[in-house]
């Protein structure tokens, strides 16, 4: 894959920074707000809630930074897709909610699902040379 069209390299860099940067920042929140997030994870029935919050934060930070800088992007995109899919199903189970909570959980579920799509798109091009990237792969 080449980025031959005008502005494609910059657009791809912006996509990496926006998607990866937001998810890495979200991951940092898992570390700074671990207690509150662990309580919510326990409420949702997640085993080992504190460890799960820390682990998911690690996936988000690793995956996000990986995409932004272009280091092992296949692993980073895979980590993000995994986190987003699992958390959509386990944390945003709108089918078990009622009333206003149902709509909020459905919105979060759908955000995670389109995030899975974006992560899979990055995974699909992970084997190509990325512009403005460190270019370290596996």
Explain the meaning of each model-derived region.
Residues 1-36, 48-62, 69-138:
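Extended, low-polarity transmembrane helix blocks
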Residues 39-46:
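Short amphipathic alpha-helical coupling elements at transmembrane boundaries
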């Amino acid at each position: 894959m080449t980025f031959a069209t005008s502005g494609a390299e910059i657009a791809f860099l912006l996509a990496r920074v926006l998607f990866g940067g937001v998810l890495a920042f979200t991951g940092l929140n898992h570390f700074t707000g671990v207690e509150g997030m662990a309580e919510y994870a326990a409420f949702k029935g997640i085993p080992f809630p504190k460890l799960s919050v820390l682990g998911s934060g690690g996936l988000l930070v690793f995956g996000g930074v990986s995409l932004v800088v272009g280091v092992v992007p296949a692993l980073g995109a895979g980590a993000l897709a995994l986190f987003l899919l699992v958390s959509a199903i386990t944390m945003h189970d709108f089918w078990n909610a009622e009333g206003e909570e149902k709509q909020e959980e459905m919105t979060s579920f759908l955000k995670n699902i389109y995030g899975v799509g974006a992560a899979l798109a990055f995974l699909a091009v992970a084997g190509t040379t990325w512009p403005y990237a460190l270019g370290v792969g596996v």
